[in-house]
């Protein structure tokens, strides 16, 4: 069986078709609004640390900075950051995530200022869309949802199909 993914990007919408043996299996259309939807993944930059809240604000390109709490960094934050640094150092080379090493978990009672610094780049995923005057809410525990499984890199403790 051969699978083919066809993506058509137009000024007002994006269409995606999944073909298996030249037969349409799945079709999706989305408007090209610049909305920040739940599940979107961005490379953000730390704008401001808030030690009193144990959180920080991250610039992901939205008009308001997004909010990232220390507990939303996830236990494998150091592993994510090491892998991200590797990828960003040489963007032309492929770094399979299967070859990435797992580092010790971050301290559950730790402080945001001990882990992050202003200007640092972090890979984040939106968990709550922006509302009113507030920007989006973020997490560093990335998850990729598929039809039969949810992939969470560096998280091998739970595997369900």
At which residue positions do the language-model features occur?
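Single-stranded RNA-binding surfaces
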Residues: 1-159
């Amino acid at each position: 069986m051969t699978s083919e993914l066809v993506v058509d990007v137009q000024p007002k919408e994006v269409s995606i078709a999944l073909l298996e043996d030249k037969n349409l299996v799945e079709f999706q259309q989305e408007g090209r609004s610049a909305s920040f939807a739940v599940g979107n993944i961005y490379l953000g930059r730390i704008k401001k640390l808030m030690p009193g809240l144990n959180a920080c604000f991250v610039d992901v390109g939205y008009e308001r900075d997004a909010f990232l709490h220390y507990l939303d960094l996830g236990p494998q934050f150091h592993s994510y950051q090491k892998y991200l640094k590797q990828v960003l150092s040489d963007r032309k080379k492929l770094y399979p995530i299967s070859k990435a090493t797992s580092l010790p978990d971050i301290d559950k009672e730790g402080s945001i200022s001990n882990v992050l610094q202003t200007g640092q780049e972090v890979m984040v995923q939106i968990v709550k869309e922006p509302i009113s005057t507030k920007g989006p809410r973020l997490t560093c525990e990335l998850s990729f949802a598929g039809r039969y499984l949810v992939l969470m890199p560096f998280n091998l403790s739970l595997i369900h199909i």
